[in-house]
């Protein structure tokens, strides 16, 4: 409500006076648009934008190429009808025929691939580990990486080699130690075995 004590403008022409409480608030400035009481601010600015867009689009396309863009604000009625048909009846204008020159083998291949993709998706989403992997999506690995040979070990140090050789069952010492502490070489034992072999 407007009061004189608030410093509002008072005039003798009642038709020109609009109380400040009834005036629309400031909602931004659009040049050339006067916001009236008959239409809302959104409709006025939207119509201004559409008119500006129509004038720009009429200058943007060449004759006999491209044509007009369908819009709801246009003096041309076919453009408005085209826009309505594209928005409302777009499913009615979908083609009802199907291609008869499709490659059936390729179609079957794509269908099977889609099924395998869904199986792999279920495998990824499985938290229990019941589902198995799809072999189609298993990346190939070289045979040595999958089945490593036990001999392909890192090289051993000299001390480790000596310990392994000493503890192996194939290791034969080249001498024999008697209780007296005397060591006899293997060649001398062979000569003794030849001599004492034929004793009665």
Curated annotation (Swiss-Prot):
GO terms for biological process: flagellated sperm motility. One of its GO terms (cellular component) is axonemal A tubule inner sheath. Pfam families: CMI2B-like. Signal peptide: none annotated. Keywords: Cell projection, Cilium, Cytoplasm, Cytoskeleton, Flagellum. It comes from the Eukaryota. Belongs to the CIMIP2 family. Microtubule inner protein component of sperm flagellar doublet microtubules. Microtubule inner protein (MIP) part of the dynein-decorated doublet microtubules (DMTs) in cilia axoneme, which is required for motile cilia beating. Binds to the intra-tubulin interfaces. This is Ciliary microtubule inner protein 2C. It comes from Mus musculus. The gene is Cimip2c.
